[in-house]
């Protein structure tokens, strides 16, 4: 069965972002595993999940709605990364690096 979302650059880049996020949060304190770590992971996973849901081809309106949700998740992720920086879990250079990938995904969505 054809999976049209796997051909989308936005889906591919957002999948790469998920992998990067999962690696990044491994360094967060263990007491954040059910807090900020979980929130960041869920926001990142939501992006390619919504892109794939929208690409399922039911309607253009539904695809746009799914992309809108993915954009919301990217903005949520950006805020959560900023929080991680402000509480000392991320350095400035790492934040900037990950934010540039978030921005790439936003531009493609």
Task: Locate predicted features.
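Amphipathic alpha-helical assembly/interaction segments
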Residues: 1-109
């Amino acid at each position: 069965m054809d999976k049209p979302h796997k051909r989308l650059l936005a889906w591919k880049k957002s999948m790469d972002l998920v992998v990067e996020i999962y690696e990044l949060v491994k360094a967060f304190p263990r007491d954040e595993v059910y807090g900020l770590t979980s929130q960041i992971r869920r926001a990142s996973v939501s992006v390619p999940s919504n892109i794939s849901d929208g690409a399922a081809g039911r309607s253009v309106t539904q695809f746009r709605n799914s992309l809108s949700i993915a954009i919301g998740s990217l903005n949520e992720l950006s805020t959560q990364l900023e929080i991680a920086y402000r509480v000392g879990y991320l350095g400035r250079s790492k934040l900037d690096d990950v934010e540039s990938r978030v921005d790439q995904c936003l531009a493609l969505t």
